[in-house]
Amino acid sequence: VKIGGRVISEYSRSYFIADIAANDDGDINRAYHLIELAKEAGADAAKFQNFKAKTIVSKNGFESLGSQLSHQSSWKKSVFDTYQDASLPDEWSERLKRKCDEVGIEYMTSPYDFDSVDHADQYVNAYKIGSGDITWIEILEYIARKKKPVLLATGAANLEDVKRAIQTLRKYNDQVILMQCNTNYTASELNFSYINLNVLKTYQKLYPECILGLSDHTFGHTTVLGAYMLGARVFEKHFTDDNDREGPDHKFSMNPLTWK
């Protein structure tokens, strides 16, 4: 699989994605700074997200969950308001892409609706599909038809979900990177008990031609080392400059020191 100028294979050096996501805290200058830090730390790509709060979360649905909320229960704002704050203005994309080109790092994003896919297409060489969309067949087809490499996260999916998603993507596109993922964002040490890296063995047997990867939300790099030994070559970790900042992703993110 080729992303930009990098060919990724079982025998190539690993490909590292610094997921800046919401860690810019709504400030494009912080985003620029994090791009620079990610490059200095050795990341191959800096990743963002394109979504609108009203199309990615149900305000009423999350409010009705109350105490059943998982990692969102620790957020100081409501789920809807947090996503509203984390959504990037469309006009940022060109500027972020330009900054990535300037420092020599791949610009990447996860689009979460059809309009966002079309918006991102002019800026990206590959698409990342988040775990939450693995059963949304229409968006999988839409992205696959763009004929660019696809990184598919499989958190919270069962094996039938994964098989269906791979079958859907491959109808139009054989450039698929299959990524194990844990979807708990609490930064709790208990998350290491649910990372299930052994599923990479299953993926390798089912799809020996696929590049494997890990989209990870645990802190540190223990899971990266384990996944590498099981065949993963693409790694995505959240990235920040300060783990003590207020926000949903800072606590479990890598920083420039731990990334190196």
Label the predicted regions:
Residues 1-260:
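Catalytic cores and adjacent flexible loops of soluble metabolic enzymes
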